[in-house]
């Protein structure tokens, strides 16, 4: 099975995504990573993937928003309709639940069926998320 992980260019996010990729590849899943800088302005096709995950940071705690480059990356990704998905935000003190709802609404507007969601914290939590995602593929 193949998994596409769309993530922002934040160093903390990249570290968490690399740990998630390692954990998922140990279970035999092929994982491809895409970020706004690496993908340029070309459209990204989600057709060959069985699962699409989005990992991003957010700003604000009263009315959190996801990064603008992540929103543009989601809009440039094609063939998302009907795909299974996972939505994840970096763990924070306040607003992570609201930020997660905002991210899921952006994904659902593109047609993704969000089946798993959460906040990324430490290594143990990332390993547990990788196991859950492996069951979805």
Residue positions per predicted region:
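FMN-binding flavodoxin-like domain, especially the glycine-rich phosphate-binding loop
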Residues: 3-36, 44-137
């Amino acid at each position: 099975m193949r998994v596409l992980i769309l993530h922002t260019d934040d160093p903390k996010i990249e570290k968490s995504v690399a740990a998630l990729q390692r954990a998922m590849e140990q279970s035999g899943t092929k994982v491809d990573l895409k970020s706004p800088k690496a993908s340029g302005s070309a459209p990204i096709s989600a057709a060959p993937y069985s699962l699409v995950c989005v990992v991003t940071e957010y700003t604000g705690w009263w009315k959190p928003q996801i990064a603008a480059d992540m929103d543009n990356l989601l809009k440039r990704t094609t063939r998302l309709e009907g795909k299974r998905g996972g939505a994840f935000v970096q763990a924070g003190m306040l607003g992570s639940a609201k930020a997660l709802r905002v991210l899921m609404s952006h994904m659902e507007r593109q047609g993704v069926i969000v089946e798993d969601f959460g906040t990324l914290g430490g290594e143990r939590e990332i390993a547990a998320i990788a196991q859950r995602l492996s069951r979805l593929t």
